Amino acid sequence: MVNKTAQLKQALENRILILDGAMGTMIQKYKLTEDDFRGEKFKKSAVDSVAEWCTWPVGELLKHALVKGITTCQTLPSPLDVIEGPLMAGMDVVGDLFGDGKMFLPQVVKSARVMKQSVAYLEPFXNATKQKGSSNGKVVIATVKGDVHDIGKNIVSVVMQCNNFEVIDLGVMVPADKIIQTAINQKTDIIALSGLITPSLDEMEYFLGEMTRLGLNLPVMIGGATTSKEHTAIKLYPKYKQHCVFYTSNASRAVTVCATLMNPEGRAALWEQFKKDYEKIQQSFANSKPLRKQLSIEEARDGFSGEWADYVPPTPKQTGIVEFKNVPIAELRKFIDWSPFFRIWGLMGCYPDAFDYPEGGEEARKVWNDAQVVLDELEQNHKLNPSGILGIFPAERVGDDVVLFSDEERTQTIGTAYGLRQQTERGKNSKSPFNFCLSDFIADRQSGKKNWFGMFAVCVGVEEMELVEGYKAAGDDYNAILLQAVGDRLAEAMAEYLHFELRTRIWGYTQEEFDNQGLINENYVGIRPAPGYPSWPEHTEKALIWDLLEVEQRIGMKLTESYAMWPAASVCGWYFTHPASNYFTLGRIDEDQAQDYAKRKGWDEREMMKWLGVAMK
């Protein structure tokens, strides 16, 4: 008995942390000692009236409940009152602070986590009384068909919920008909579409065309890395001109637009402003003249010769396919570029300077520290299995294309990588006088030089999405988004790791020491451009990588119908070793090149416009 009394006394003397239910932040610390349970104050706590003792300060209330063994205390009439009272009051403060730039995204998502978990706890009690809460409006949000990227969508979803919007998140790769039917069935106020890859722009255009065809007039918000106000004005607005389509650049802006749309007068005024902006952009686009003229494709091809007379392509030490399975997280950490991580969270600066920014620096350090905890856990529990695959094949340039072979004699063709060439005339301020195509950095047969062509695909592991969904199911959006952000960094680190291994060991054409900052600054020979990005903006070329490397069979990565990679934390690309190879921006191409490319690919007019329309602008 003495031992139990001592244990109780020790427990009482330990600090008890009282958490404010609305914000989930520590507001008081109480050190309870034996003296707290003696004297007049304690005697008063023997009161039997629930109405009286429930009005005491929270510290006194806790003391009384602890001694009396009371596990329930009602200070508000119903669970719904708790949600719509202190919880929503707290989130209103969060929304206001975020909108005013006084609170940063990681803080908002953490507050949303407390809100979600609190509501999840209260929901069974609310359901028992058949109570339903009010909201500022109902929003259906989705990443469009063919696209798997959803970090930005998830952030918008969380911030919307922080502002008391009911959000129906349909996830990724959602067809237009499912979004529309859900919006109708749920009597939605607003639809929000997200997309990262350029084919998603076509899907958004199709979606708005369907909305018009069906006679629907719900406001539609557009967002994502590949979207812009200019594209919305020129391509999307005409598809939904009689209704409302809004481009929103970030989560804060999305909330502002949604809040305004829920007020009929505000909605009309906002749409008028957007229409004026769109029509101004359209007029400017129609009247614009190119700063430099476009060359014919034949003129553009009369340029870079590769300087093959003075250059001998390095012979790989190893050719064929090389697999990398379960690369240790500890190894990949050395290759991480942290700067893009902060941009995901809306924080300023590059690593490590972001920590010293007067606005957001402290929060940048906190979220970075949280990321280190995630990496530590991944190192220990091995729940992610980063994998990659690369291949090196004999190759030669044929015009703007790279033809690949299975044999050193270059007689057995196994595939062709089709290239696009810059057509805009080079100006005096251009980095190079040449109109580049990536095939320029591969020797043709006439040069007499033997050349090779490399390709790769990497992902952090197909297990990532299961872990993310687990956090979401637990109402923990913060760790879900944090894991996705870390996963993206690991995927890029994996790509950097393979490229380093290729240069120094597998192809073995350079002798270099590991230097992470040097890798970030690309202080090495060779490049790894990706299909779908500025130098090679045509996404269907990923199929060649998948076919030759057997990517899906070997490491589980997949391509969607829009050629987005699954899982989202994935990277693929080509390897070039020529010392003059560089990452250039293709820019606008003209119809003569588009038709020539389509002919080489075996496309009809429809396919040409689908996959090259963005490059043709």
Curated annotation (Swiss-Prot):
PANTHER family: METHIONINE SYNTHASE (PTHR45833:SF1). Pfam families: B12-binding (PF02310), B12-binding_2 (PF02607), Met_synt_B12 (PF02965). Gene3D superfamilies: Cobalamin-binding domain, Cobalamin-dependent Methionine Synthase, domain 2, Homocysteine-binding-like domain, Methionine synthase domain, Vitamin B12-dependent methionine synthase, activation domain. Signal peptide: none annotated. Methylcob(III)alamin binds at residues 84, 146-150, 194, 198, 251. InterPro entries: Cbl-bd_cap (IPR003759), Cobalamin-bd (IPR006158), Cobalamin-bd_sf (IPR036724), HCY_dom_sf (IPR036589), Met_Synthase/Corrinoid (IPR050554), Met_synthase_B12-bd (IPR033706), Meth_synthase_dom (IPR036594), VitB12-dep_Met_synth_activ_dom (IPR004223). PROSITE patterns: ADOMET_ACTIVATION, B12_BINDING, B12_BINDING_NTER. It comes from the Bacteria. SUPFAM superfamilies: Cobalamin (vitamin B12)-binding domain, Homocysteine S-methyltransferase, Methionine synthase activation domain-like, Methionine synthase domain. It comes from Haemophilus influenzae (strain ATCC 51907 / DSM 11121 / KW20 / Rd). Residues 33-134 form the B12-binding N-terminal domain. The lineage of its organism: Bacteria, Pseudomonadati, Pseudomonadota, Gammaproteobacteria, Pasteurellales. Residues 288-617 form the AdoMet activation domain. The keyword NADP does not apply. Belongs to the vitamin-B12 dependent methionine synthase family. This is Uncharacterized protein HI_1042. Transmembrane segments: none annotated. Residues 136-272 form the B12-binding domain. S-adenosyl-L-methionine binds at residues 337, 528, 583-584. Keywords: Cobalt, Metal-binding, Repeat, S-adenosyl-L-methionine. One of its GO terms (molecular function) is cobalamin binding.
